[in-house]
Amino acid sequence: MARERIRSRIDRRNFLTGVAVAGAAGTATTIMPQGAAASATTAPLTDPAARPSALPPTAKMAAAETGTPQEIKRDNGTPGSDFMVDVIKTLDIKYLPCNPASSFRALHESLIDYGGNKSPEFLTCLHEESAVGMAHGYFKAAGKPLLTLCHGTVGLQHAAMGIYNAWCDRVPVLVVGGNDLDAAHRPPGVPTFHSAQDINALVRDFTKWDDTPVSAQHFAQSFVRMYKIATTPPYGPVMMSLDAGLQQEPIRENGEKLYIPRFVPSSPPQGDSGAVKEAARLLANAERPVIVVDRAARTPNGIKLLVELAEALQAPVVDQGGRMNFPKTHYLNRPPNVIGQADVIIGMELSDFWGVVNGFIDNGDHGIGFNESKIKAGTKLISINSVELITKSNYQDFQRFQVVDVSMPADAEATLPALIEAVKAAIPNDRKAAIAQRGEAIRKAYTDGRANVRRNAAIAWDASPVSTARLVMELWAQIKDLDWSLVASEGNVSFWPNRLWPMEQHHHWLGRSGGYGVGYGAPASVGAALANRDLGRFSVSIQSDGDLMYAPGVLWTAARHKIPLLAVMHNNRGYHQEVMHVQRLANFRNRVVNLGNDMSPLGTSIENPDIEYHKLAESMGWWAKGPIKDPADLAPAIRQAVAVVKSGQPALLNVWTQPR
């Protein structure tokens, strides 16, 4: 109602109809609204009431607003952007999170008018990094990629961090960047500032493929190709530069019939049969085999396959959490310290195999610390990792080089069936009793470990600000009977959800950001919640305070598009990772760290003033409550918030927490 009242009072064209325009040869005199001239002759300009509140429009501006648009002779052919929409629709892309811009105005108009704003539906974002982050989170919940559009040089630079996260996290995101390529025809001024000869170069180091189509048919081929490349393991973001002129150019009848290539998915690469057989031999004859996984389970079936392999070997599984790889309730789920006793280690889709088997001790000299091996001499190492197929050189996401004994540049999930069959065939009959006995020992260690985790979680249970373990368990108590999905939670709450919640299904945990870029959590949560809304799941995120402030506008997007999400703030009022870095260096240098007037080293705290995240969320259309500092207030607040989210709205709780 408020919006309607405002529109009845203020209208740009009605406002400008009273503007008096005078001048000759392009020269404009002072322009005032009707009735202002008479008062201006009697009131001195030094009188504040007589001064205009804003600069009046120029004659040119007024004419542009009130005049009749110039008649432009147009070709009656089909707009090229309409055909582009036809291409996009063949791939069943459900949503398009995007910040609007002129370099893809033709495609935008075709999507919402010709395409009916369906498949894809345009989702208004307030920042390009939010748009890419939403697509990132959506894929991990739905298993299907989204398309996003970026505006030239400036929009793509905004999006770059989100694209890098997707690259490191092996997630397909389809990015199309609008660009005014033809210097002879591009508009002068701002559009030229926002153009480049090769905008794809901005992100080429961390995209799987890119192209710049020069015709409508070229677009059709390249768009289907980019979708195919992005969705073939190893997954990754892809990029297309799309000329604004090409979008607006009509399709003329010149005898050449346009066609849309049919999409046929590629099968993922599988491990060589000889390498699979050798890996199975090593595992079947090992005394203490260990399985380490990071992004091995691409789908729910990947979890089942990993359970089958682990049970065949009675081998402990170390899940590094890039995806939900292995049930937390399974007795073979074990912490990383089991690596030290291993004689054979198989790593599947690991981000950092070197870091799995080696330690790095920070001695205060960055990049010089001490290295130490975590494994016994002679331990055999097996790697199945599809990322070897797309390794690049500039960005160092491939980590340190680790020598292994068997290396398969292949998709782990696709290779698992053959590996399981080979392992079962390779286990000698006289080893089966020892393998079963090994499993019983691991089962006891699992039971003891769970009890120890629960004891540790009880420490500072009644503390204020709230302990992160208390926060996590109070949250669990309210969502445990729902079909829940933890859509985002970096390791900043001491991994309590992964340690305490009975995570068993693929959607229970969607992993982390990949590139560890701050600002991922909120957009990815909203994107995943969008997917879960359509799947009937309840979405919850544990939202870091500093992370939210990188892209808070995504809260508005969630409210605007009715995306239900429960965001519980981990509001420790600081960048605690950096708190520890500065404190560590001060300790090394035998100094007392300078806190100023804050609780943390200068430059690391987010306080004085404290950000009222609940009010921020309320201003963007969320139900919100806070600040919550007393743990006794948590349960009723979470109960309220859960009810709000179940009704279809987003809700945020601003909880003051301990640092970790």
Regions found by a protein language model. Give the residues of each.
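Conformationally flexible catalytic loops at phosphate/diphosphate-handling active centers
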Residues: 69, 197, 225, 229-285, ...
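C-terminal segment of N-terminal export signals and the immediately downstream linker at the start
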Residues: 31-81, 85
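N-terminal secretory signal peptides
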Residues: 1-10
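Thiamine diphosphate
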Residues: 185-194, 339-341, 416, 496-659
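Active-site diphosphate/adenylate-binding microenvironment
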Residues: 81-84, 89, 107-112, 441-531
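Glycine-rich, acidic loop regions that bind phosphate or pyrophosphate groups
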Residues: 178-220, 319-442
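Phosphate/pyrophosphate-binding active-site segments
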Residues: 51-75, 214-217, 241, 255, ...
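Glycine-rich, anion-gripping cofactor-binding loops and their flanking helix/strand elements
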Residues: 140, 293-390, 503-535, 550-553, ...
